[in-house]
Amino acid sequence: MCGIIGYIGDRDSVPVLLKGLRRLEYRGYDSAGIALLQDNKIAHLKKAGKVSDLQSLVDDSPIKGNCGIAHTRWATHGEPNDINAHPHLDQTGNIALVHNGIIENFNTLKEVLIDKGVLFTSDTDTEVLVQLISVLYYEDETISFEDAVRAALQWVVGAYGIVTICADEPDTIIAARMGSPLVLGVGDNEYFLASDASPIVGHTRNVIYLDDGEIVKLTRENHVISNIFSKEVLIKTLSEINMSIEEIEKGEFPHYMLKEIHDQKHSITNTMRGRLNLDDGTTNLGGIEDCMPNLLSASRIYITACGTSWHAGLIGKHLIESYAQVPVHVEYASEFRYRNAIIDPNTVLIAISQSGETADTLAAVIKAKEMGALTLGICNVVGSSIARETDAGIYTHAGPEIGVASTKAFTAQVTILTMLALKIGRKMGVAKDRGQNLISALNRVDDDVQTILDSSNFIKAVAKDTMHTDNFLYLGRGINFPVALEGALKLKEISYIHAEGYPAAEMKHGPIALIDDNMPVVFIAPQDETFPKILANIQEVKARKGIVISITDKPNRELKSLSDYVLEVPRTHQHVFPITSSIILQLLAYELAVLRGCEIDQPRNLAKSVTVE
């Protein structure tokens, strides 16, 4: 993986492709490359490093053509270097291919091809695929390039989103998908292909989302989508991209992450818009209305996700069990799909994914559906694979999230789970005034977020005082333990400081051995029933000279006296506190990363959307 862009039309493809790659940088990558048809030959350039390095290559060795493909790579097979960068060419130099995904049986295929005399130049699984297409194409003079691609894909075990061109058919692009997303942009006598919609925005709003097992042949004039295996031609309707150029640009902010932290004063409200019913103390979630009887009769609920979305799921567990009194199990999708989970028709699986393309989460959905469970999706990207695969779902409407470290998508997911828990709870007899109290607090969130953003100078001061430490510990209790986990993850992701999140009471069972006068310990300390216990934990840290940073919505005299720093959020409902307190943790991680000179929006080794298993 990580980013694909293709173009065919009347324009020079180079500016389109390079601009598309820049739009895909947020996904994370280690190299970039471009290939196009120039004078009926493949011209290509690729380079380890940034898209700007590739741009310099293009400036030094200009290439031009109306049909081309480009790629940003995040290494899975083979180290990040010029040779392993995409696009990959076959040994004739007539076929170029870019690929997201993993070819699981590439070693077996490679041995077959070596026996046929194929010489490999890279260490990647992708080169195996382009060489296989080449052998099948040139061994049979009667076969078309499209059918050679089809034939090659019959051999492949694994996941792929591929886009390929051939000098023998110079006005054609072939693309196919199995487990890795591809979006087809439909313009006026031109087409675009991309791994997500962001490179297409500004060129056309009309798109078609390819499904697994589909292949598309593009010329300047038309497109034909068919099934890879049966060759059945498919008629698919156009969808409209629901994002604007402004949403995917930084504007006045130095980094996307900071922009998206500030976006939360509006994005959380957008998530709730039209969904809160204060009079009845409930929520309106049209996307799941038809399956409410199944939800109400569920014997168990699984929440499955990865990374930040998993932390949102842990918060959702507390909320659903509190309001609906239904047992909830939260599982990493990568673990859930490989174990013998108890699933029957009375089971509900909720899959959470910002992109809607997370490979392990999608696989967990498919497994649960096969076993008879009702599946629900909580996604940000409209038309994504998980949104289409699940039986029903709720969009977060947080707007595009470009920074690799999730911010506004996380708070949107928690907001959705809060509304879902309340909706189920009210149907099952939760008192109306209890729902009204929660909704009143949700209605104040935009003001609360603004208050937090206004306190960012003090957060900068805390970051400055702690920037040279090597380790952080984040502690919370109950519903705020997942907040501690998320705070630690944010810090690790973008500042490269080692951090761990722990239940506060578990500190005594190991982590307390690490605490000294160089260890900042962040306490999530709301004024709820756990507050006296949190104070006791803080005293244990102070006794060992730890640096205490407390996040609270009501600092009392004792908390202030025990804490080196107190970061305050506005007083709010205990089930809204995880939303507001997480924003302070996002700002703290951001300021520490800035002071340490880290790459904020594209942290090392990370990808925004993990579309491989």
What do these predicted ranges mean?
Residues Q154, Q264-Y302, M371, V382, ...:
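Active-site phosphate/pyrophosphate-binding segments
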Residues V183-I208, S334-A368, E506-K542, T572-Q586, ...:
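Glycine-rich, anion-gripping cofactor-binding loops and their flanking helix/strand elements
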Residues M1-K250, P254, T269-R300, Y338, ...:
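Conserved short alpha-helical segments that host acidic/polar catalytic motifs at enzyme active sites
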Residues N66, A70-I83, D279-P293, G316-I352, ...:
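Glycine-rich oxoanion-binding loops at beta->alpha junctions
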Residues M257, I547, K560-L562, T572-E613:
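Generic C-terminus detector
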Residues V156-E190, M467-E493, D528, L535:
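Acidic/histidine-rich
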Residues P293-V430, G435-R444, P526-V569, L588:
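Glycine-rich phosphate-binding loops that contact phosphosugars or nucleotide phosphates
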